[in-house]
A protein has these predicted regions:
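Short, small-residue-biased leader/transition segments that mark boundaries at the very start
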Residues: 1-3
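Charged/polar, low-hydrophobicity segments characteristic of intrinsically disordered regions
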Residues: 58-73, 133-138
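C-terminal interaction segments
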Residues: 92-138
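Glycine/small-residue-rich hydrophobic helix-like segments
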Residues: 65-103
Length: 138
């Protein structure tokens, strides 16, 4: 068995090692935002935020359960720092979220500042609901 396929128990859930590692990277990034906010400093994302973007997509089904919504396939298309393009999910999905990777990452880690206007566009009912979910603040 490949180690990335091994299951771990985490917060009463079983997750694979890859998802666990990506989750820990996302958590570290999110807490870095908290520190910058406390110091009233701006945080500039780098291409390493791709791991946080992947976390958001990998965690979409769990976020749906927490918000008592029926999960549907979700396509994510993002432009990251240095104009890197990142896509996750089936191209044929009826639900998609497109836009700035920084906004996506802040949504999925529960770090959208009050009054911040998101630059994400949505297509499909599930995608519209997803960006408004109460995402777990990791």
């Amino acid at each position: 068995m490949c180690i990335r396929d091994r299951k771990l128990t985490w917060w009463k859930n079983e997750i694979d090692c890859r998802t666990f590692a990506v989750t820990k990277l996302a958590e570290t990034w999110a807490h870095s935002l908290d520190v910058y906010d406390a110091m009233k400093k701006d945080y500039e994302d780098t291409v390493r935020v791709e791991h946080v973007a992947l976390f958001g997509w990998l965690n979409a089904e769990q976020a749906s359960k927490v918000n008592k919504a029926k999960y549907q396939d979700l396509r994510i298309e993002l432009i990251g720092p240095e104009y890197k393009a990142w896509q996750f999910g089936d191209e044929q999905s009826e639900n998609s979220i497109k836009g700035n990777a920084s906004d996506w990452c802040r949504v999925v880690t529960g770090r959208v500042p009050k009054g911040h206007k998101l630059t994400l566009s949505t297509e499909g009912d599930f995608a519209k609901k997803f960006v408004k979910f109460n995402h777990v603040k990791i």
